[in-house]
Amino acid sequence: MSFLIRIGICILSCIIITSCDNNAKPDEQIDSTSKKYVLNEFGQITSTEFSTEAFEPSQNCQECHPNHYQEWSESMHAYTMQDPIFFSGWAQAQHDYPETGERFCVQCHNPVAFLTGEDLSDFSTKEELLGSDLPAQIKDGISCDVCHSTTSLSRTVHADDNIAAVADYHLYPGEGIKFGSIQDPEANEYHESDYNPIFNRSELCLPCHDLTIRGVEAEITFTEWNRIPGLAMSGALSCQDCHMKQKDDGTHDHHFTGVDVDLSYPFGESPLYNEIEILLKSAVDIKFEYYNVTLPDSISKGETLIIPVLVSSLTAHSIPSGTSFSREAWLEVVIRNDQGNIIYQSGVIGNNTESLDLTDVDLLLFTTQLMGENGESVNSITNAYSIINNSLPAFSDRYHQYNYDVVNDDNFLTINVRMLFRSFKPHMLNEHPDLLSNLPVFEMESICDTIYLKL
């Protein structure tokens, strides 16, 4: 299905949904009360109404919400201050930007520390931080209360050249009220529960899932979604629809499943491994066709076999998204003869930790590359002055053609195409060889066909 057709269906669906209820009103924030804070030019707190004690430790939620707590504890939200890769990047940011680097990363990886002004610059490893006497609210990273004390929507983080933190939060912790998406929450003796429709909107994932720096669209998952006309106008197919799927009992999954894997686990044993695999398998479709070009049933020796491949995104943001510069998705194409021998290949790696051959002229690779001030390749967003974007846009199609000259007397040829994904380019893990061995490559989609040779 073409991009225009998919968008048309989306817009039509939105019109139908909206028109079904003549009394429908736009979602508005029910309670816009929030506590205030002031930042200086370096992104540091100069005054704040927030205190660490106002936020509940996530473990306090476990007794009444054991499933939600368990899911959160396995999520990347709970892992934000435990990830060795984050600590490496954070150290580099602090080295390059001594006045602002610490706060720049903390603004999203630890909102409680950011809003209360808690300085975390003394901690260079997760072991140091978790072994410290810091309160649990800080160690939790992105805790339950960070989201469930939200009262109104935030905006994209636009960082300037000095990368000073500017994250915009609207939270109301410490007042005995938890906000969420349930319209008629059950009363309980522990806290007041208030419905807020913003919990069904993609904007709830701001400010952290949309970042520009020096005008460079470095991590813009929300913007990618927001640029789709049908979705932006209606709010249909929100982030939560895919990443917090509704369960049979009406509650939502709190794994926040994306594409990031906790690499501290042995290969394939991360708690979210299977969920990530399922999510990625629903992200794209690939076919041997493009408009009037199709794969032939047979071919003669001496002819050129044209292999048309159409990659169609089924995803409401780019592939890859988020830290797209560290991620890569690509097509692996293998042709075998009737003896099973490989006679052509593109996008093949020997193992999960091997880098792609970027000199392969046939390689179809979806990724981005950050560029520094002098046009050099860089790996850190804090040093990005431009970006080369070769990602697959939301709900778009990408056509790629492979040509193979048939020179042997084989009875048939077998063509296998797979779309593969990994959350880190191997060189991004050079400082963490212990984690590199746990890096998975996921198969997103695969197709296969056989071409017979004419006698």
Positions of PLM-derived features:
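Long, well-ordered hydrophobic secondary-structure segments characteristic of membrane-embedded
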Residues: 63, 82-121
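C-terminal motif of bacterial Sec signal peptides marking the signal peptidase cleavage site
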Residues: 18-19
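Primarily the internal scaffold of c-type cytochrome electron-transfer domains
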Residues: 26-52, 71-97, 122-385, 390-394, ...
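Sec-dependent signal peptide recognition
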Residues: 2-10
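Extracellular Ig-like/FN3 beta-sandwich strand-entry sites
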Residues: 304, 410-414
